[in-house]
Amino acid sequence: MIDVESLAFSYVSELTGDRVDALRGVNLSAHPGTLTLVCGSSGCGKSTLMRTLTGLVPQMTPGELEGAVRIDGRDLAEVPLTEVGHLCSSVFQNPRTQFFCDTVAEELAFCGENYGRDRTDLIESSERAAKLMGIYALMDRKLSTLSGGQLQKVALACALASGAPVLLADEPTSNLDPAAIADVRRALEFLKEQGMTIVVVEHRLHFLRGLADQVLLMEAGAVTRRWSGEEFYSMTDEERCSLGLRTLVDPGPPEAWVASGGSGGVGAGGEGPRLSCRNLSFSYGRTPVFQGFNADFHSGEITCIAGANGVGKTTLVRVLCGLTAPNSGEISLDGVTSSRSQRRAACALVMQDTGRQLFSDTLEGELTIGASDASGEVGEKLLADFDLANLGDRHPLSLSGGQKQRLVIAAARAARRPIVILDEPTSGVDARHLDSITATLRRIADEGAAVIVVTHDGEFASACADRLITLTPADGGCANEGKQL
């Protein structure tokens, strides 16, 4: 059981010296066998609340904490951080930050080994968690070879294997395909039946319909609304939109996605393709990732690339933008065969893990790395367009996941490259900023760029895509090349 009373947390910003009230008077009770959903806009304090429930705040994050957090009757203020793992397991927003081992099997056993659990019990719990999350076939794989979605499933499996009575999951589906999201739902159903206390922070809300027992809405560090699960999922679209929340309806698999906002693209009417691929193939050693891939990407057009986790979508866009060399095939720019260096110069890339491409110590500095004219009023307007203007003094790496995502997209727009490639740009993004990113990508396309987006987000793809390409695991090839949305 989790019991939170009058919880408040504040700290002094190292950059500005100002006091930041990250949590304000939060109260929460969560019982065994229940699931609590916490939602709200990016940067409202959801992740800080989760870090407080794990004891990382204030033990690892300096600041002033008021109120009480009790798990299974124990006050976390009196529990050494090394013992908190007995009480709760957690899945962070970025799963890469919580891994310690080389392979999936080693990572699954890591927690239990540190607590001296019996070897037989370790093996059984690891295999059970891996099967529950659909990653048993990955047990011998190195973590460094997995896709972002596969890593997210490994992090969830590690939490399940720990055997702790409480699960804290911070956006556990942000990089997952529809089938993997269904795996997460089944796992959460199983854990509820086993009597686990579960708290989930999410922007994607549809998959918890019928599972969430209570729903909390956070704004500016405070809980401002509470519903039962039934009340929450009965609200109208008008109510949901007024609260800035994403759809409550499952968009389904890629073949069910239907456009409501794509304009068709200004380049769809007859211009030759900006980027063209013919018979493109790539493999890791003897393992093929995709074979015989053919596609054209036009100026003014937004093309979404969908497919299961690990099918090769990220590898494909790395090849397209020149970061990785294909084994065979040809890639042309404006009808002329291109080199990798030419494609790197022509492409702006927004990576899946945006923290890996933040290099400056200011937000404006990030914009000017690829565009020297994106300073002063130009930079301020661009930051304002992405709802980042009030964060100008923050270090980029101190931003929330959604804020980092928007900053890197802003930098890509500032660079004004003819090809813009984005890998999961809406992971960790709330409804308002999803709409903002959709509008921005449409503007970039309308200005003449070819926009290529890897996504599992049906709500997003239906709002902006002109065309959908679906990669399949059979051969990594294009199962649904050129479907118009």
Q: Which sequence ranges carry the predicted segments?
A:
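ABC ATPase C-loop
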Residues: A159-L160, A412-R413
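Hydrophobic anchor residue at the start of the ABC signature
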Residues: L156, I409-A410
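Conserved ABC ATPase "signature" region
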Residues: T120-L138, G376-L391
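Catalytic Walker B motif of ABC-type/P-loop ATPase nucleotide-binding domains
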Residues: L167-D170, V420-D423
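H-loop/switch region of ABC-family ATPase nucleotide-binding domains
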Residues: E202-H203, T455-H456
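Conserved ABC ATPase signature
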Residues: K142-L146, Q150, H395-L399, Q403
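ABC ATPase NBD Q-loop/coupling interface
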Residues: A68-E83, E330-R343
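Helix-to-loop junction immediately C-terminal to a conserved catalytic motif
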Residues: T54, C321
